[in-house]
Amino acid sequence: MATAISVGVAVPAASRRREDGAGPPLLLRRRCLVEGQVRCRLPWLRPIRHNVRVQTSNVNVGAGSYEGGEAGSHGEHLDSSATRDSNKPTKPPSGSRYPQSIAAVLLLCALASAFIVFFKGQPSAVVAMLAKSGFTAAFTLIFVSEIGDKTFFIAALLAMQYQRALVLLGSMAALSLMTIVSVIIGRIFQSVPAQFQTTLPIGEYAAIALLAFFGFKSIKDAWQLPDNANGNLQGNSESGELAEAEELVKEKVAKKLTSPLEVLWKSFSLVFFAEWGDRSMLATIALGAAQSPFGVASGAIAGHLVATFLAIVGGAFLANYLSEKLVGLIGGVLFLLFAVATFFGVF
């Protein structure tokens, strides 16, 4: 805070000649007027005004007495501190890192729980438990189904424009909710009323039928792709999942999203509605009807997490080297294998 103080300094003229021009110069005599306080002035003075700016600091100084050099050094210290503080550039507060912190905490919790479960029992027992629970089947099917899927490219396109952690959180929230809903629908097949119950495992047969249907359909669609579809996913964007994802993102995200909540909501809504009725959802329903709901839900969510993470980190890179035809054939074969395994009770 700077305070301007005007100080008037009167500089007298050295001499004044007589009017007739003769004789030595007359000395000026001061006349003092007393009006409450003494105010002296000299006649025929020319006032010269100067503005003196005094720099003050808004530092609170406690009461105390200073003598001699202590007072001077204290004043110099305050002046130098104020100067240094005023010369330092002010930095705006950094943005919050809550989404990254939440993702890191969830990842650490998952790793800690996996570590405890794995080392508490024998590794072979853990693997057998995962296989029997449906975790392995759900993870493999969902992971292969999501690679090159519409939701895969939606997450990749959004991650190119916005913060990756926010896109991952929004996408995984949608996929986790969709997985839970699918498992609940699958368990409804097991809750048949008593008057309709028979000795036939209707839920398992429905799951086998769904898995076989998607297996044959995936192989048929991949086989009908043109020969130039062997190149990569991005090269076939005119008629593939990438073209649909690009059109959907351009239509729904017309303006730039600035708020983190907007990015979370847009990622959630786009992925949720794109996943509704998709083959991965129906595959989760089929597995949920035939196997353990907890194993299927955890395996499906883990498969979604790995596939979505790959899409966000290197979706554009993977699209250059993955063949749409090859991905479709592998997915169809896996669907058929799990249908056969479910029929013979392997899982």
UniProtKB/Swiss-Prot annotation:
UniProt membrane topology term: Multi-pass membrane protein
Entry's family note: Belongs to the GDT1 family.
Subcellular locations according to the entry: Plastid, Chloroplast membrane
A biological process from GO: manganese ion transmembrane transport
Positions of the UniProt region annotated as Disordered: 70-97
Pfam families registered for this protein in UniProt: GDT1
Residues spanning the membrane: 99-119, 124-144, 165-185, 196-216, 257-277, 299-319, 327-347
Key words, A-Z: Chloroplast, Membrane, Plastid, Transit peptide, Transmembrane, Transmembrane helix
Residues of the transit peptide: 1-12
Protein name: GDT1-like protein 2, chloroplastic
Domain of life, source organism: Eukaryota
Record-level GO cellular component terms: chloroplast; chloroplast membrane; Golgi apparatus
GO terms for MF: calcium ion transmembrane transporter activity; manganese ion transmembrane transporter activity
InterPro entries in alphabetical order: GDT1-like (IPR001727), GDT1-like_CS (IPR049555)
